[in-house]
């Protein structure tokens, strides 16, 4: 790390995607850990949820029973159950998977404490929300336990928490008063994602939206509240792109401190030219075999293979644009090479299509065809196949352009391809990621790293990064200007990109592929890590400035370890600071009874005390009672009398 920056001696990193692939955050942390290994070694500690504890062995995790076994035994005495080992990614970083289910019976107590202490509004939170709160809470306890067992108070310790799902860990650490510098990184905003996913104009109309009101409208108040309080209470608040920083600055109660763009480690790509050629040939062969089995027609060796991958966010990820663009080429007078388009988007399914598998194994009917490789759980409600029907995309035998939906995670064991996503990606000729909402955009970056030309948009963080950090011609990537009102222009641009790739000469194609790889290097961790270093350094500086608050703990790191009380909430703080007139004592009782949350009359009552304070408090009656002047309460008491 740069000499003029404070370097952490220990870095804890908490995410729902540690050893648990859901989206791009998995790649962020996995690749960054490899880069940081030489600097932090075993002092870079990753914490994730033990979501595989009741199922088969986690393919991403290898437990090491010998690692820190004394501490593990000590932590178990305070109810912390965890598995310690290595993440099965390059570099094999230390990973701790925590079991948060033993705290289920404490859920209400924990939520009440966060409400009283920080104003986190969890009333509307469903089980997924509560599960996330418990995970972050236990992750915070793990960091506290490790600190008290191993550290002296002299070390510089940073804990980075990714996304709102881990934010309760920040609140826990702040509550227990350890000298641990906290960084909160959001890879999107709750409200921004909701607006974009519900076809509302996020970018043109952003300033007109009230984040709290929109959160209530979309029933994500709990998520938004935790996200807001996490940003507010962290030492340093970061996000992954300038476009998402704009969201954060508007919807959350704090400005972003540092923009920390994501990076990539090219160790994930073939190490030699020979390996690259072998992997590309194997991928193309498999893609052509499956396409032939699904369509019922052989696929030519020089066919153009196009793809899109990522989460099933139909509009946000530009899946709608992808389908419409392919259809635009299909219905035009295009007479070039065969084009086979693969939509590799995981969705709910009930396993591989058995007739397709039989056909691939040479046992099934040669006449069987399908557009979907796996049995969809609710095909009648699926938007991708629904759009196929609307546009008449049926992979007709005489059509030179065909489309396939692959709704399974490509983890090497999907039942049809039985190859991992990267091992198939390398065989494509073009990827399209025409996103509407894409805070960063790992998928086009991954595509470039594997030498596959791609398309993204100006609304993707990575697209903006290319525009500002690669100042040469870049035929390997097209960045399409996208806004709230030019959908058809984006479809046309994507269709033109397909035609372009289909018509280039072999020599031009090689130039595109070489440029793709070159562009990807601007986002290597060796170039991007500086922004994370800044965030860690600033967090340490902020923590140092508050060291007086931590002096007692620093001198006696294990003091009070056995005396932490976790069984019951205390209302002492409100009882000793509030002096309500006798006629209004009922407000005290009502504010602590969750009944007010769903009673409109009760809400109106608290609002009437002081509408401005009610709004600024996020509709928190405890804050209202603490904030409003005694003069105002006396006025209300006289009215009540």
Task: Enumerate the predicted regions with their spans.
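A short, well-structured beta->alpha microelement
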Residues: 563, 579-619, 628-632
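Catalytic cores of nucleotide-sugar-dependent glycosyltransferases that transfer UDP/GDP/TDP-activated
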Residues: 1-563, 567-571, 587, 622-623, ...
